[in-house]
């Protein structure tokens, strides 16, 4: 059996797809090949994502490939997937999640707490920028885009004191040795679905059940809880929004942030994990009442 898996062209996206292909090979006797696609979000690098507009900038072109039957499935970073799935598509599986934290990479291995006043920090994320300002109001936030390697190179090219990147991506491309500091999830709440990969298929695909074996239940319901929070607030990856759900002894804890009326609101909620979607919605409702 031969499967075509669509993904973005970046090194990170290809590595993530190879992770899924390896998992598939361990479970089933399946030959897989990658279909590399340049998405709208990959093509327009000189403009910040929130100014390009729209949701699903990194997934729509890939969904077209599945619609045209050029691909059987797609692998995405779940933080790039809008909460509203197009008709006929579904996330069939979310494998075990990687480290959800954000990392700080500095020019000369200077710790975040030791940064000079007015230090220049690169990030294209409104979520990260807002939380950095809460931690250090003096920081100068510089928007940067590009793949992981490109952003790391911009530290020297653009005379930055450091940048913020997801730990998961750095680990997957073997660049985590460059990390200067790790942010705790309470001081830098991650993006919705950060560290998680999702396998997208068309609902009518005859072989879609093969991917279900790759599903990691606790990882999946944590991501679904975060996405319920995002849906209730009508957020996306361009909003100042973040959430992280974790499970211990069947109890789910969610921390979430959202910018409302020019104020960053942070709330937490705890409950049984079988109520994961209700917990995400309730957390959003608490924020809207603030």
UniProtKB/Swiss-Prot annotation:
One of its GO terms (cellular component) is cytoplasm. Keywords: Porphyrin biosynthesis, Transferase. HAMAP family: Porphobil_deam. The modification S-(dipyrrolylmethanemethyl)cysteine is found at residue 237. Binds 1 dipyrromethane group covalently. Belongs to the HMBS family. InterPro entries: HemC, Porphobilin_deaminase_N, Porphobilinogen_deaminase_C, Porphobilinogen_deaminase_C_sf. This is Porphobilinogen deaminase. It holds the Pfam family Porphobil_deamC. GO terms for molecular function: hydroxymethylbilane synthase activity. Monomer. It comes from the Bacteria. Pathway: Porphyrin-containing compound metabolism; protoporphyrin-IX biosynthesis; coproporphyrinogen-III from 5-aminolevulinate: step 2/4. The porphobilinogen subunits are added to the dipyrromethane group. One of its GO terms (biological process) is protoporphyrinogen IX biosynthetic process. It catalyses: 4 porphobilinogen + H2O = hydroxymethylbilane + 4 NH4(+). SUPFAM superfamilies: Periplasmic binding protein-like II, Porphobilinogen deaminase (hydroxymethylbilane synthase), C-terminal domain. NCBIfam families: hemC. Tetrapolymerization of the monopyrrole PBG into the hydroxymethylbilane pre-uroporphyrinogen in several discrete steps. Its cofactor is dipyrromethane. Its EC number is 2.5.1.61.
């Amino acid at each position: 059996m031969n499967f075509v898996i669509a993904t973005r062209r970046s090194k990170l996206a290809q590595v993530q797809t190879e992770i899924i292909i390896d998992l598939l090979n361990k479970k089933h006797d399946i030959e897989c090949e990658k279909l590399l696609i340049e998405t709208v979000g990959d093509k327009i690098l000189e403009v910040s994502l929130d100014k390009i507009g729209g949701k699903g900038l990194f997934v729509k072109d890939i969904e077209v490939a599945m619609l045209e039957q050029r691909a059987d499935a797609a692998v995405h970073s779940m933080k790039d997937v809008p909460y509203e799935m197009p008709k006929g598509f579904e996330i069939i599986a979310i494998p075990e999640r990687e480290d959800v934290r954000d990392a700080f990479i500095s020019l000369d291995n200077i710790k975040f707490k030791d940064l000079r006043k007015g230090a220049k920090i690169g990030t294209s994320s409104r979520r990260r920028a807002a939380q950095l300002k809460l931690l250090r109001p003096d920081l100068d936030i510089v928007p940067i885009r590009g793949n992981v390697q490109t952003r790391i190179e911009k530290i020297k090219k653009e005379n930055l004191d450091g940048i913020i990147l997801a730990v998961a991506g750095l680990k997957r491309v073997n660049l985590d040795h460059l990390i200067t500091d790790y942010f705790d999830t309470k001081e830098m709440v991650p993006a919705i679905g950060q560290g998680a990969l999702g396998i997208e298929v068309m609902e009518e695909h005859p072989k879609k059940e093969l991917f279900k074996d790759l599903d990691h239940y606790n990882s999946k319901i944590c991501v679904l809880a975060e996405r319920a929070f995002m849906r209730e607030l009508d957020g996306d990856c361009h909003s100042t929004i973040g959430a992280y759900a974790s499970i211990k002894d069947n109890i789910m804890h969610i921390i979430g942030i959202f910018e409302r009326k020019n104020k960053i609101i942070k709330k937490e909620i705890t409950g049984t994990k079988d109520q994961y979607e209700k917990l995400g919605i309730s957390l959003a409702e608490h924020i809207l009442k603030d």
